[in-house]
Amino acid sequence: MIDLRYLALVLAVTDARIAIAQQSSPTVSPVSTTVTVLGSSAPISLGESARTAIVFDTQQNPLEFESVEDYLRTDASVDIQQRAPAGVLSDISVRGASFEQTLVLLNGLRMDSAETSHFNLDLPVPLGALGSIDVLHGAGSTLYGSDAIGGVVDFTTWKPEANALRLRAGTGSFGENQQAVLGALVGKRWSEVIAGDRDFSTGFIADRDYRTENASTDTRLASPLGTTELLLAGDDRAFGAAQFYGDYNSWERTKGWFAGLTQQFDSHVQAATGFRRHSDIFLLERDQPTGYKNQHVDDGFEGSLRDRHEIFQNATLLTGLEETTDHIESTNLGEHGRNRGAGYGEAEWRIPGRGSISAGLREELFSGGRWVTSPMAAATLWLPHSFKLRASAGYGFRIPTYIDLYYSDPTTLGNPNLKPESAWNFESGMDWYPTPRIAASLTLFYSRQKNTIDYTRASSADPWQATNLSGLHFAGVESAVDWRVNRNSQLKFSWTLLTGAQSALHGLESEYVFNYPVNDARAEWRWTPIHSLFLDSRLGVVQRYQQTDYPVWDESLSRESGRFRPYVQITNLSNTGYDEILSVRMPGRGFVGGIEFAITRKR
C-alpha cells in the first residue's frame, strides 16, 4: 500500500508555509468556472459538466514545467509511463486503460499514429506555444471516434492577446541544455505565434542520451467568412533507447510534421482538416548500424464538419461528419492503408441551476465493411448546499495499429488475426462546491472490456506476442480536492484506486496492460511567497500492479514577471530509484536552471 508518510510530510511543510502567506483576496477565480472543451457538445464549465474533466492552463506559469508529461502527472487518474525526460517516447493511459486506449488531440484533430500508439505524445508544437491541456476521464468514442476507450487528451494552442517575445536558455544535470524562442504578434483581426525549442542531454546512463527539437507557426484570421486558424508544426527526436525494447542498447530517431486548418463559419458551423506525417528509424543495436534496422513512414488525413444548434430553449443538438485515412510504408510492416467515415449526433437539455441530460450516437464505417456503433448518455442533478450528482455511460473502441498486426523482430511478434478492442464504461459521482475557492469530487467507475489487445508470453525465453485478452474489467474510485486558498496559494490533492480481473492472462506474462497503478496519490502546492516569485511543489506516490510503491517529489521556482525571469526545476528530489515501464530505469535527482528574457506589449 501507499506509504502516507510522504504525503504527511508535504502537508506539514505546506501548512507552515501557507500561514506566512494568508490573506484574503476577492480576485480569486471560482474553481467551478474553468471551461473545458471535452465531453460535451459545446465548451462547458467544469461545474456544469456531466463528465470528469481536468483543465491545465499552460500559460499561467510557463516556467514551472519542462514538458506536457509533467502537467499530466498531477492528475492521479492519468498514468504517464515515460522512458526518458523531455517527452521522449512517453505512453499515457487514463483510469487503467492501456496506452493504446487513450486518444490524443491537437486543436481537436487526431494525433494518433497508424504505426504505434507509443508516438501519440510526440507533439510537434513547443510547450510555450500551447495554451491549455484538457483531459477527459472515460470513454469518448461517440464524439471522437477510435482509441477513446480510457480517455481523451486535447492540447490547444495559445491565442495571444498582446505582442510578445520570449527567449529562454538553461542547463542542468546529465549534460542537459535547453533553448526556446517564442514570438507573438497581434493585429486588429489577426494574430501570429512562431515558436521553437530544443532540449539535449548526454544521458544519465550510457545510451540514454537524447535531442528533441520542435517548431510551429500558428496563424489566426478573422474575415467575413468567419474565424480561420492555420497551424503548421514539426519535430525531430533522436535518442538512445537502452532497454526500451528488451536487453539491447538500441537507438531511435523520429520526425513529425503536422498541418491543421480550422474554419469557424459562424457560431454554429465549424469545418476542420488535418494532415499528420511521422517517420521512425530504429536500430536494435546502436553499435551495429548495418544490423537489424526498421524504417517506417506513416501519414494520416482527417476532415470534419460540425453543426451545433439550439433546437429549443436550453436544448442543443450537435451533429457531425468525419473522414479519416491512414497509410504506412515500412521495411518491417510492408505497405498498408485504410480509411473510415463517421456520422454522429448528441442532444443535450440543460436546465440552469437544476441539471442536465444528454444522449448521443456515432456510426462509423471502416474499409472492409465493418460498422461500429458508439452510444453514450449522461446526466447531472444539482442538490442543495452546492452538491451536484452526475452519471454517464459510454462505449469506446479501438482498431489495432500496424505494429500490433504485422511487426516482427527478435523480441516482439504482431498478430494479423487481432480483433478490434472495445469497452463499456460506466461512472457515477458527486461534486461539491462549498465556496467559490473549493471544489471536491468523488467518482466511482467501471470498465468492461472485450478483446483487449496486449503483448503476452509464457516465459522470459519467449518473444512477446500480440493477442486479444477476454474477460478483462476494471473498477475504481477517484477523488480530488482543489483549494484556492487565496491569490497567492493553491492546494490540489487527488487519489485513484484501481482493481481489475486478472484471470484474463491465464498464467501468461503481460507487457503493457497489467502495468497500471493500483494506487496513485498526488499532492501539489502552488505558492507565490513574494511578488513575482512562484514556487510549485509536487509529490506523487504510485504503486503499480504487483510492485512496491515509490515516491517522486518535484520542485520548481521561477520569477513570473519582469524582463529577466530566472528559473530552476528540480526533478525526483527524493532521488527515488524507480521505473514506470518494467526494466526501463528512470533518472535520479536532477535539476535544470536558466533564465528567460520576456517582453510583452499590448496594442
Residue ranges and their predicted role:
Residues 140, 152, 156-185, 195-206:
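Short strand-turn segments of transmembrane beta-barrel domains in outer membranes
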Residues 182, 220-223, 391, 512-603:
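Conserved C-terminal beta-signal and adjacent last beta-strands/turns
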Residues 32-69, 91, 99:
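N-terminal periplasmic "start-of-domain" segments of outer-membrane beta-barrel proteins
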Residues 110-137, 156-158:
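Short acidic/polar hinge/loop motifs at secondary-structure boundaries
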Residues 245-266, 296-298, 382, 395-449, ...:
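Outer-membrane beta-barrel signature, preferentially recognizing the C-terminal barrel domain
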Residues 201-216, 225-300, 412:
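Flexible loop and strand-edge segments within Gram-negative outer membrane beta-barrel domains
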